[in-house]
Amino acid sequence: MDMRRYYANPGEQPLDCIKPDGGFTAIFRTIACIGDSLSSGEFESLTEDGQRGYHDLFEYSWGQYIARAAGCKVYNFSRGGMTASEYCDSFAASKDFWNPAYASQAYIVALGVNDLMGQNQPLGTVADICPEDCERNAKTFAGYYGKILQKYRAIEEKSRLFLMSMPRDCNDSAEQDGKKAAHAVLLHELANVFPFTHVIDLYRDAPVYDERFHENFFLSGHLNPAGYRFTAELVMTYIDYIIRNHPEDFTQVGFIGTGFHNVSAKW
């Protein structure tokens, strides 16, 4: 038996060894995915007379592909067009997504496209986050994003947080690519502030979404079913890599939400 696939390996990159079954992602029994259309399995329809429609079909979301592959329960806390500010100001409360009944062992946060590209909101910095009171966070993307992390950590103190950056695309302008790069930097800074937090850095490690990728995995401006499945494999593989490279952060995942812990391991 080759045990190398179960350990951290020198020189291995996060997406070198794809895990279609999720690998160690399966250690989480509950995962909540917070995001926009790409977290919602959104498909774009187009009629003969040019009318476009946008449809969130959650069973096709990468989160539900993860649920089926890894055997986890996955919540879709998402909607097409979502921003961190709308999530905090109205959406989450209107959908009861702050309800402790939905407390999860892991949260995957995939926001930023509509905030930074669509609405041109200021990115902000980690200094926009008030550690003592999330209601005092600055009204920047960083401030709202940090508020989401703070509120879910208040619900489940020991949850593991995964922050997802945006993959590069051949159709991005230099300005858009620059915003994606800055967004990724911010996520790494947030991961240094919040304990048990890691970055799924698709900007750095995922393949560039080139013309061939669009032909295979896109339907107009959104992913097609295979594209969402592909994204699920990226996310699961990345989480598996993180767990193998930081086992001390995940030894007690089984105790999250139980009220128990083991003092001999990181908690």
Where are the regions a protein language model picked out?
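Structural recognition of the beta-strand scaffold that forms the well-ordered cores
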Residues: 32-35, 39, 73-78, 105-110, ...
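Active-site segments of SGNH/GDSL-like serine hydrolases
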Residues: 114, 148-182
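Conserved SGNH/GDSL esterase-like catalytic core that processes O-acyl groups on lipids
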Residues: 44-139, 143
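Catalytic His-Asp segment of secreted/periplasmic serine-dependent ester chemistry enzymes
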Residues: 166-267
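A structural motif corresponding to the C-terminal end of an alpha-helix
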Residues: 65-73, 147-162, 186-200, 242
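Aromatic/hydrophobic pocket-lining residues that form the small-molecule binding cavity
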Residues: 141-145, 183-184
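Serine-esterase "nucleophile elbow" of acetyl-processing enzymes
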Residues: 2-78, 97, 192, 248
